[in-house]
C-alpha cells in the first residue's frame, strides 16, 4: 500500500520571502540559517542528508538521493492555519483580520454576556507576559484573560485551578461562534496556565485550538488521514479517521510511531516546539537543541519506511528567534522528500500546495492544485 507522511517542523523558515516587508518583517528573517549561526552550529545528520538544512541556507551538503528545495507561500498570512491549509490546496486570498488595538467592544460585551462574567486584558500581548501581568487579578476575580497577537487569534487564558479545562474549552466554543462574520477571526485558542504570584505563572500543554472552518481541501478527498498534534484542529477535525492530540515534540514522536503502525494512507504531523517554545521566546540555542532531537526522530522514521512510502518534511511559516520580534515571520519554507526515485535540488517553487499535489500524485488521487514535486 502506498503511503504518504508529511511532517511539519513548525516555524522552521528558510529565508526571507520576497513580500516579507508587506507582512511587517523588515529585519531579513531566515530562521534555520540564523539558528545555525547563533547556536554555533548543531549536529543533525539526517536533516543534512535529505537536504532540509541546505534548503534552509545551512552549509551542509545533501546526499545524492536528496530531493529538496524551498516553497513560497502565496496565501495572505504567515500563521499555522494559513500554512497548513495552503499545503492542502487552499489559497487564502484575503487576510484574516488582526486586532493590534484589541477586539471591538461589542464583541467583548457579547462574549461576556454569553459566559456570564467580565473579562480582562483585551489587548495584543505576548502570551507568557500577559499571564504575569494579569494572572493575579484573574486568580482573585475569576475573570478570563482575553488577548490577541500579531495573528488573527482570540486567545483566552485561565488558571487551571480557577477555571476547569472543560469550562475554558466551552468559553472557546462560545467565542468561536461569536468570532465568525462580521469579525471572521481565524482562530480561538484556549491558553490554560498554572502557578502563583510568588513563583510566577506558566502556560501548560493543554492548549486547544478552535479554527475558522477550513474550505474544501485535499484531506476531504483522501479522508483516510491520521493527524498528529495540532493538525486535526487546524482543519476542525474534518476528514481525519484517526487523531492523536499530542502537545510537545516528545509526545509527537511517540504518536508518530503509533501512526506508522496504522493502516492510514496519509499521516500528517506537526512538531510545534520549534515555534512555540523557542521561536516565540527568542531562544536560538533551544531551537538548535530541538532540531538535534528531531534529527534522531527522523532517523527512526526513516528506518520504518517501506519502499512504497514517501516522507515530506516542510514548515508552515518562519519564526526567527534571533529577531527582535516574537511573532511569526514571512519566509520561504524548506521541503525535502524522502523515498522518491531520484535526487535533485528543486530550487524555489511558488505555492505550498505543492505538498498536497505531491501527496495526491503518490497516492493516485486526481488533484489538480499545485506542483507535483516528484516530477519537477
Identify the role of each PLM range.
Residues 1-376:
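Feature captures the catalytic ectodomains and active-site-proximal regions of enzymes
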Amino acid at each position: 500500500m502506498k503511503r504518504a507522511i508529511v511532517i511539519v517542523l513548525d516555524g522552521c523558515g528558510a529565508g526571507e520571502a520576497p513580500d516579507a516587508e508587506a507582512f511587517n518583517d523588515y529585519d531579513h528573517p531566515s530562521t534555520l540559517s540564523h539558528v545555525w549561526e547563533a547556536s554555533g552550529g548543531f549536529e543533525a545528520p539526517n536533516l543534512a542528508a535529505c537536504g532540509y538544512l541546505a534548503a534552509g541556507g545551512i552549509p551542509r551538503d545533501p546526499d545524492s538521493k536528496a530531493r529538496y528545495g524551498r516553497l513560497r507561500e502565496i496565501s495572505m498570512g504567515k500563521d499555522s492555519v494559513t500554512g497548513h491549509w495552503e499545503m492542502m490546496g487552499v489559497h487564502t486570498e484575503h487576510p484574516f483580520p488582526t486586532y493590534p488595538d484589541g477586539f471591538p467592544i461589542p464583541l467583548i460585551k457579547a462574549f461576556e454576556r454569553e459566559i456570564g462574567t467580565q473579562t480582562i486584558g483585551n489587548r495584543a500581548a505576548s502570551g507568557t507576559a500577559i499571564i504575569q501581568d494579569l494572572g493575579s487579578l484573574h486568580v482573585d476575580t475569576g475573570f478570563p484573560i482575553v488577548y490577541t497577537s500579531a495573528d488573527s487569534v482570540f486567545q483566552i487564558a485561565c488558571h487551571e485551578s480557577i477555571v476547569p479545562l472543560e469550562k475554558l474549552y466551552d468559553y472557546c466554543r462560545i467565542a468561536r461562534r461569536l468570532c465568525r462574520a462580521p469579525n471572521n477571526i481565524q482562530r480561538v485558542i484556549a491558553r490554560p496556565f498554572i502557578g502563583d504570584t510568588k513563583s510566577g505563572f506558566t502556560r501548560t500543554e493543554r492548549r486547544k485550538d478552535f479554527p475558522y472552518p477550513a474550505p474544501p481541501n485535499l484531506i476531504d478527498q483522501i479522508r483516510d488521514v491520521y493527524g498528529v498534534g495540532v493538525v486535526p484542529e487546524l482543519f476542525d477535525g474534518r476528514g481525519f479517521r484517526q487523531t492523536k492530540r499530542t502537545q510537545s515534540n516528545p509526545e509527537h514522536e511517540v504518536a508518530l510511531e503509533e501512526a506508522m503502525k496504522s493502516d492510514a494512507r496519509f499521516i500528517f504531523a506537526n512538531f510545534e516546539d520549534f515555534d512555540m517554545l523557542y521561536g516565540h521566546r527568542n531562544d536560538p540555542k533551544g531551537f538548535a537543541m530541538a532540531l538535534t532531537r528531531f534529527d534522531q526522530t527522523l532517523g527512526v522514521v526513516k528506518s520504518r519506511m517501506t519502499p512504497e512510502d514517501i516522507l515530506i518534511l516542510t514548515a508552515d511559516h518562519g519564526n526567527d528567534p534571533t529577531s527582535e520580534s516574537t511573532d511569526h515571520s514571512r519566509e520561504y519554507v524548506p521541503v525535502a522528500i524522502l523515498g522518491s526515485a531520484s535526487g535533485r535540488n528543486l530550487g524555489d517553487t511558488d505555492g505550498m500546495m505543492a505538498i498536497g499535489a505531491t501527496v495526491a500524485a503518490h497516492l493516485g488521487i486526481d488533484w489538480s492544485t499545485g506542483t507535483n514535486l516528484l516530477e519537477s
